[in-house]
């Protein structure tokens, strides 16, 4: 099914996804290939919950087996927050927003998005 024409929207559902970030690329938001929806990502915050050590984060848009970096190995200082998204963008059908950390259990993510159909 094709993604909806966002001029003729029927439903907009606000959502929030949360995730402890690991050292393997893992999706925080996935728009399945035949969803009939488009996802509007409004905010992505990465918190370093380790009180001592800095940690790096990589965020990518994964499309058709290819990772397109939004941020690549950006340092998140201990006890700090990184605001990754400065302006909203869309995840089309088949797209995922993935996160990878340099150290497991140091970083957590909160992502606010809308499912549009």
Give, region by region, the residue ranges found by the protein language model.
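Short, surface-exposed beta-strand/strand-loop-strand elements in extracellular ectodomains
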Residues: 51-73
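Buried hydrophobic-core signal for structured, non-transmembrane domains
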Residues: 42-47, 96-99
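Residue-level signal for short segments within beta-strands and strand-turn junctions
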Residues: 48, 61-63, 113-115
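Extended, low-complexity, turn-rich repeat/linker tracts enriched in Gly/Pro/Ser/Thr and Asp/Glu
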Residues: 48-56, 103-107
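C-terminal interaction-tip segments
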Residues: 1-37, 101-117
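Intrinsically disordered, low-complexity Pro/Gly/Ser/Thr-rich segments with frequent PxxP/GP/PP motifs
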Residues: 65-96
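Short, solvent-exposed loop/turn segments enriched in Ser/Thr/Gly
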Residues: 37-43, 91-93
């Amino acid at each position: 099914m094709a993604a909806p024409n966002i001029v003729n929207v029927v439903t907009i559902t606000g959502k929030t996804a949360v995730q402890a970030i690991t050292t393997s690329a893992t999706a925080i938001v996935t728009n399945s290939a035949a969803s009939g929806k488009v996802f509007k990502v409004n905010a992505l915050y990465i918190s370093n919950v380790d009180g001592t050590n800095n940690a790096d984060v990589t965020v990518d848009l994964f499309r058709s087996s290819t990772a397109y970096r939004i941020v690549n190995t950006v340092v998140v200082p201990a006890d700090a927050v990184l605001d990754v998204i400065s302006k909203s963008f869309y995840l089309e059908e088949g797209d995922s927003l993935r996160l990878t950390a340099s150290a497991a259990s140091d970083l957590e993510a909160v992502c606010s998005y809308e499912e549009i159909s």
